[in-house]
């Protein structure tokens, strides 16, 4: 055994000597160059610029109510966040943050504290507008009306979770146009995986430039099977939030048009066809409110609405949003297909019953 080992070693040495004689370049060992990195010359990826632009305009909101068991003392009932929208002192928050409040306190990040006036609130969008009377300038949230949120955009959620103090969480826009999360709601939610916890409601969802993208409003605490989902937060798009704010400031409430129908849209390939006509896209009526505007005009369940107020009826939500912008009392044409016949009804728009 030992002799075999010596023989193997000797053969290896002989082969190595031959290779070195034939290929002298093998004698040179080139050292591996290790790149030198001076960390002082590089800037780490950061969203500090966005935070510095937006965070001062995000405030803490405290809902205080009387506690009859504590000698009618005011105690904090709920807490949330809000966003200062302009120098006049108007602040957007969620309605559920200030529900049943006897007093609303707003705390700014610079240490100033104000008692806020409730300008108005809207149940369908879960939005409320507050006003503070501040001397001196106020930080306001940057808004770029030309900016449209897109899936994949980096976003930061700013708020006061669990009253820990202002906190920033980061994620992306996971989806846009989410509907059906609130059965009576009118929101087209932005979905994000940025953490939105208790106390973040009413805070700001901003992009990497610090521009307002939405108002944080809810997250899923538990699914139907008891699991706690992660990365499911939702925000109301800033376009809708600012529109509701303007209406609340102007009227003290949101006045919406209403024609009293419910329906679902159908794709052209599945639509009814009239004799010699191309497929028709529209909204199938599945509910007509008794004595509502549509019922009084003659519209029935199973009618196929193809246009409302001279605009094609493509999406049920979009059509209802268009009707909501029409002043109550206006008369609008609604075109439907019924039994392969096209009918036009004149519908008098009423005010949505839950506008107050």
From Swiss-Prot:
Q: How does it sit in the membrane?
A: Single-pass membrane protein
Q: What is the lineage of its organism?
A: Bacteria, Pseudomonadati, Pseudomonadota, Gammaproteobacteria, Enterobacterales
Which InterPro entries does this chain map to?
PDZ (IPR001478), PDZ_sf (IPR036034), Pept_S1C_DegS (IPR011783), Peptidase_S1_PA (IPR009003), Peptidase_S1_PA_chymotrypsin (IPR043504), Peptidase_S1C (IPR001940)
Question: Transmembrane stretches, by residue range?
Answer: 5-27
Q: What is known of its domains?
A: Deletion of the PDZ domain eliminates the heat shock response of the sigma-E regulon, but not the acid stress response.
Keyword Ribonucleoprotein listed: no
Keywords linked to the UniProt accession: Cell inner membrane, Cell membrane, Hydrolase, Membrane, Protease, Serine protease, Transmembrane, Transmembrane helix, Virulence
SUPFAM superfamilies in the record = PDZ domain-like, Trypsin-like serine proteases
Q: Null-mutant phenotype, please?
A: Loss of heat shock but not acid stress response of sigma-E regulon. 10-fold decreased survival in acidified murine macrophages.
User: PROSITE patterns from the xrefs?
Assistant: PDZ (PS50106)
Q: What is this protein called?
A: Serine endoprotease DegS
Annotated source species? Salmonella typhimurium (strain 14028s / SGSC 2262)
Q: Where does it live in the cell?
A: Cell inner membrane
Subunit structure comment from the entry: Homotrimer.
| Further comment found in the protein's record | Regulated intramembrane proteolysis (RIP) occurs when an extracytoplasmic signal triggers a concerted proteolytic cascade to transmit information and elicit cellular responses. A membrane-spanning regulatory substrate protein is first cut extracytoplasmically (site-1 protease, S1P, this enzyme), then within the membrane itself (site-2 protease, S2P), while cytoplasmic proteases finish degrading the regulatory protein, liberating the effector protein.
Domain PDZ, first and last residues per copy? 256-341
Recorded hits in Gene3D superfamilies, A to Z, give: 2.30.42.10, Trypsin-like serine proteases (2.40.10.10)
Q: What is its EC number?
A: 3.4.21.107
């Amino acid at each position: 055994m030992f002799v075999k080992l010596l023989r193997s070693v000797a053969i290896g040495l002989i082969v190595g000597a031959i290779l070195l004689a034939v290929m002298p370049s093998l004698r040179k060992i080139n050292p591996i160059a290790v790149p030198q990195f001076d960390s002082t010359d590089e800037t780490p990826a950061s969203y500090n610029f966005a935070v510095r632009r937006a965070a001062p305009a995000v405030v803490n909101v405290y809902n205080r109510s009387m506690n009859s068991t504590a000698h009618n003392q005011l105690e904090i009932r709920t807490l949330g966040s809000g966003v200062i929208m302009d120098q006049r002192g108007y602040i957007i928050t969620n309605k559920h943050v200030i529900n049943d409040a006897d007093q609303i306190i707003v705390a700014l990040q610079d240490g100033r504290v104000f008692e806020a006036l409730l300008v108005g609130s809207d149940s369908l969008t879960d939005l409320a507008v507050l006003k503070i009377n501040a001397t001196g300038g106020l930080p306001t949230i940057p808004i770029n009306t030309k900016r449209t949120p897109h899936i994949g955009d980096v976003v930061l959620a700013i708020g006061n979770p669990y009253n820990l103090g202002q906190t920033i969480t980061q994620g992306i826009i996971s989806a846009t146009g989410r509907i059906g999360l609130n059965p009576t709601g009118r929101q087209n939610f932005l979905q994000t995986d940025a953490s939105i916890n208790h106390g973040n409601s009413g805070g700001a969802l901003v992009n990497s430039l610090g521009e307002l993208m939405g108002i944080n409003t809810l997250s899923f605490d538990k699914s139907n099977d008891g699991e706690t989902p992660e990365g499911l937060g939702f925000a109301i798009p800033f376009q809708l939030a600012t529109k509701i704010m303007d209406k609340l400031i102007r009227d003290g409430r949101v006045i919406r048009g209403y024609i009293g129908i419910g329906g679902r849209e159908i794709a052209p390939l599945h639509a009814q066809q009239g004799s010699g006509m191309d497929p028709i896209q529209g909204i199938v009526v599945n509910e007509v409110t008794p004595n509502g505007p549509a019922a009084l005009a003659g519209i029935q369940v199973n009618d196929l609405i193809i246009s409302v107020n001279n605009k094609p009826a493509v999406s049920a939500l979009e059509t209802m949003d268009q009707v909501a912008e029409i002043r109550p009392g206006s008369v609008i044409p609604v075109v439907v297909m019924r039994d392969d016949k096209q009918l036009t009804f004149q519908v008098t728009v009423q005010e949505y019953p839950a506008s107050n």
